[in-house]
A protein has these predicted regions:
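RNA-contacting regions in translation and RNA-metabolism proteins
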Residues: 1-42, 52-77
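Glycine-centered tight-turn and secondary-structure capping sites
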Residues: 46-50
Length: 77
């Protein structure tokens, strides 16, 4: 799933080399993905009124739901 998130994020930003995805699992089984992009690209990832980041979160949740897991996406600035 990290690869999917990185692929989608790289398609949205101007500096795809700066995209980094780090995933870790919390005690309750929730997988948290931290997405790091260049400072100039944070707005592109978040989108107008958060629509783009919400769409990314929805895609990640749909992928995780197949496995019965819970996923969170944080954009690190």
């Amino acid at each position: 799933m990290e690869d999917l998130l990185a692929y989608l994020a790289r398609a949205l930003v101007d500096d795809p080399d700066a995209v980094e995805v780090e995933g870790f699992e919390e005690d309750d089984g929730t997988v948290v993905y931290e997405l790091t992009v260049a400072d100039d690209d944070v707005g592109k990832i978040i989108g107008r009124h958060g629509r783009t980041v919400n769409a990314l979160r929805t895609v990640m949740r749909a992928c995780a739901a197949r496995d019965g897991r819970r996923v969170l996406l944080d954009v690190v600035d």
